[in-house]
Amino acid sequence: MYTLYILSLLCAFVTFSECKYPPGPIYPHRPIYPIQPVYPDHCPGVCYIACPNGNIHDRNGCPICRCRPDECTLPRKIGPCRASIPRYYFNFVTKRCELFFWGGCQPNKNNFETIYDCQGYCGYAERRYPYPYVKRTY
């Protein structure tokens, strides 16, 4: 518990300008335990609960990997209206952005106009690192 308290202090006082590395690729929420990445640009796929934004931090408390926003775990929502507007949603099961036809009203936050918006927000990283638990040796 003391470690989580120290991590929360680091998250509160270290600014991004002091950080060595930019944020890495986005991954879904994983079991919560602290872990240091093998490479600074590779996300190990876990989230600290000590930090309010759920980012993984390096030894200096700097963000190196952003966890997938909760919106990306929502199911697609067509809505009660009868329009047929092409939209994209992130399918949390297949780990891909997929096309669906939105009714035109009452969307949830997992509703994107383009596949690029969906991939940028919910993570295109699954194609590059489809198995975040597997340590690559090549």
Curated annotation (Swiss-Prot):
A Pfam family that the UniProt record links to this protein: Kunitz_BPTI
Query: Which cysteines form disulfides?
Result: 72-122, 81-105, 97-118
Q: Is Disulfide bond there in the keyword field?
A: yes
Listed GO CC annotations: extracellular space
The UniProt record lists the BPTI/Kunitz inhibitor domain at: 72-122
The yes or no answer to whether the keyword Signal is present is: yes
InterPro entries reported for this sequence:
Antistasin-like (IPR004094), Hirudin/antistatin (IPR011061), Kunitz_BPTI (IPR002223), Kunitz_BPTI_sf (IPR036880), Prtase_inh_Kunz-CS (IPR020901), TFPI/VKTCI-like (IPR050098)
Main subcellular localisation: secreted
- Signal sequence coordinates: 1-19
Record keywords: Disulfide bond, Protease inhibitor, Secreted, Serine protease inhibitor, Signal
Its subcellular locations are: Secreted
Q: In which tissues is it expressed?
A: Prismatic layer of shell (at protein level). Expressed primarily in the mantle with highest level in the mantle edge and lower level in the mantle pallium.
Q: Which GO terms describe its molecular function?
A: serine-type endopeptidase inhibitor activity
Q: Write down what this protein is called.
A: BPTI/Kunitz domain-containing protein 1
